[in-house]
From Swiss-Prot:
Signal peptide: none annotated. GO terms for molecular function: DNA binding. Residues 93-112 bind DNA. It comes from Streptomyces actuosus. It comes from the Bacteria. InterPro entries: DUF5324. This is Putative nosiheptide resistance regulatory protein.
């Protein structure tokens, strides 16, 4: 016997037991119902005159004792106290109206905000019902869960990269500002000038042959060479 057969057999036996219990209890239930109706009718017949008499007596006593005293107390109340009571009642009604006018937009806003939540809950309930009916497998549910987890991880990574980029940009900007403050342009020393050799013939740019110099330059070079020869002699 399979599990389904055993469940069906247990369900059938439970159903038979319930039907048998209902058949056994039915006569007692009918008898109890009849007795309850009889007792209720009897109590109503016996208590109705007493209740009516008590109500009449209370009405008479109120008219004879309490009503005159209330009227007398009302006449002895100072006008200022009565006016204050009336003003308090008016203020209470005004405050109630203001509270209603103030709370109505908030309630409407809360209801409007609860709409998407209600729709989401209905969607999830429908999805759960479909899953219970077997139209969605456990594998599909696991895929959805993994998809949501991937989205959450991607969102966290993007937020982390954005924060790191902002921090790095701020640090670079701060470093540039500090470097500019520590080393201003006017404080930077110019590079040293390179020395030009005292003598030597000028050559062409490609170094292939000597360039044709100006006669004055040639005369100056000749004088310098003659002076060097005299010194060496």
């Amino acid at each position: 016997m399979t599990r389904i057969d055993s469940v069906r057999a247990a369900t059938g036996s439970a159903k038979d037991s319930v039907l048998h219990a209902a058949e056994v209890v039915a006569p007692y239930a009918d008898t109890a119902k009849e007795r309850a109706a009889h007792y209720a009718h009897e109590a109503r017949v016996r208590l109705a005159p007493k209740v009516t008499l008590a109500a009449e007596q209370a009405r008479v006593q109120y008219g004879a004792h309490l009503a005159p005293r209330l009227e007398q107390a009302r006449t002895h109340v100072p006008p200022k106290v009565e006016l204050a009571a009336q003003e308090a009642a008016l203020r209470t009604r005004k405050a109630a109206r203001q509270a209603a006018d103030y709370s109505r937009p908030m309630i409407e806003q809360a209801v409007a905000a609860a709409g998407p939540v209600r729709d989401e809950a209905a969607t999830r309930a429908a999805a759960a019902l479909v899953a219970l009916r077997g139209q969605v497998t456990a594998e599909d549910i696991q895929k959805l869960v993994r998809k949501h987890e991937r989205r959450a991880r991607t969102g966290r990574a993007v937020r982390m990269l954005a924060v790191l980029g902002l921090v790095a940009g701020g640090a670079f900007a701060a470093w540039k500002w500090w470097d500019k403050q520590a080393n201003p342009d006017w404080l930077v020393e110019p590079p040293e000038a390179t020395e030009v050799p005292e003598s030597g013939r000028l050559t062409s740019v490609d170094g292939s042959a000597e360039a044709v110099l100006d006669p004055e330059v040639q005369a100056k070079e000749a004088a310098e060479e003659a002076a060097k020869r005299d010194d060496q002699a």
